[in-house]
């Protein structure tokens, strides 16, 4: 082995094998591009993005870690989402969860 050498297995690496996923359509209704990272809570993404946020609650993009998807102004695209796993606690982002995902607050009707 050479110091710093990579020894990789042959074949493809499959992401999200066996994970439940959903597919939603997302439209950028804004006038600027919006980029969403791989581990961002999709329901809390930029308000210029139009999609079913209720359906996306507790989900993130089903893409490799460190990647992002860019939505150009006026663009509509289909994305796959997978649920957060582990303790399913979120803090930060836009501050809409700040704790366990499974204790989702009820939406107030107006």
Curated annotation (Swiss-Prot):
EC number: 3.5.1.5
Disulfide bond positions: none
GO-annotated molecular function: urease activity
Family annotation (InterPro entries): Urease_beta-like, Urease_betasu_sf, Urease_subunit
Keywords associated with the record: Cytoplasm, Hydrolase
One record GO biological process: urea catabolic process
CDD domains: Urease_beta
Top-rank lineage group of the source organism: Bacteria
Reactions mediated catalytically: urea + 2 H2O + H(+) = hydrogencarbonate + 2 NH4(+)
Principal place of residence: cytoplasm
Pfam families the UniProt entry points to: Urease_beta
One GO CC annotation: urease complex
Subcellular location: Cytoplasm
Pathway per the UniProt entry: Nitrogen metabolism; urea degradation; CO(2) and NH(3) from urea (urease route): step 1/1
NCBIfam families the record matches: PRK13203.1, urease_beta
Similarity comment: Belongs to the urease beta subunit family.
Entries under HAMAP family matching the protein: Urease_beta (MF_01954)
Subunit note: Heterotrimer of UreA (gamma), UreB (beta) and UreC (alpha) subunits. Three heterotrimers associate to form the active enzyme.
Record protein name field: Urease subunit beta
Gene name as annotated: ureB
């Amino acid at each position: 082995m050479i110091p710093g050498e990579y020894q990789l297995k042959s074949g493809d690496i499959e992401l999200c094998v066996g994970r439940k996923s959903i597919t939603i359509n997302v439209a950028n209704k804004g006038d600027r591009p919006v980029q969403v990272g791989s581990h961002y809570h999709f329901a809390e993404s930029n308000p210029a993005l139009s999609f079913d946020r209720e359906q996306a609650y507790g989900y993130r993009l089903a893409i490799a870690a460190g990647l992002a998807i860019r939505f150009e102004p006026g663009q509509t695209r289909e994305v796959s989402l997978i649920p957060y796993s582990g303790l399913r606690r979120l803090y930060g982002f836009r501050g809409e969860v700040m704790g366990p995902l499974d204790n989702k607050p009820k939406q107030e009707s107006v």
